[in-house]
Amino acid sequence: MAAEPRSVLFDRKESGIYHCYNRCVRRASLCGEDHLTGKSYSHRKDWIADRLAYLARGFAIDVLDFCAMDNHLHLLLRNRPDLVELWNDREVAERWVHLCPSELEKLQKQQARRLASGLISATAVADVREQYLKTMMNDQTEMITLRDRLSDISWLMKLLCENIARQANREDEVTGKFWESRFQSDRILDEANALACSMYINLNPVRAQIAVAPEECSHTSLGIRMLTVRDMLLSVFGPDALHTTADDQAAMIDQADVREAANRYLDRSREEQQERLEGRRPAAEQQLALRSGS
């Protein structure tokens, strides 16, 4: 029986939860250890986590859960077209440039060369971004298209999988497919199935005997959340907090006088992560040269 087309499965105008997954070509461990050479490619799982964080800041799509394994990837995603409706044209344009900056960067490089040749002023170079955004905002047909894309799970998967494939091929100095297909997906119809899917995704490393317990899974959303809570408890209460029971730790987090400090810590962690990702951004974008609309 043929799979249901994505055009039927995904309703861009309606919020929904979807389980999306993809495998490396021939199910090879391209994000794990090469058993022939002994070389580890586990750092590519960090690429996936970092890229997801970057894309989540642009798309109107919630990354509810994810798991990066040696040879495949699981995501639990929720599209939010209702959020896109609240954004004005400038925010839509800014978000799209964040996701696909290559065309703007190309214009900026052209203007920089013209500036070096003395053909234009420094002011003209500084205005390139603003003019580029205004051109996008003045094209209402383009804006309608971009609004659809910003809550389109297919576009998030495209920009995720293409990015990882390009980086991996460049690292291996090869060409060709990295993923066996675009991706596969199932719609989650109720809360019970959403919870079951979340458990399935986060317990993948335990089931595969890569980890003994969920908190040891460094490339799952649950593992990252637990590590964040652990770091927060250490920051606020000190090392003794880690020797208490789970109930005691929950009570610590719930203490009214601690919430503000905990929130400040989490905000600082998010800012540090964003600075780290933005620090990588120029080199990564130059390498990948993603084209909007391709």
Please state what every model-predicted region is.
Residues 1-294:
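Short catalytic/metal-binding and nucleic-acid-binding patches
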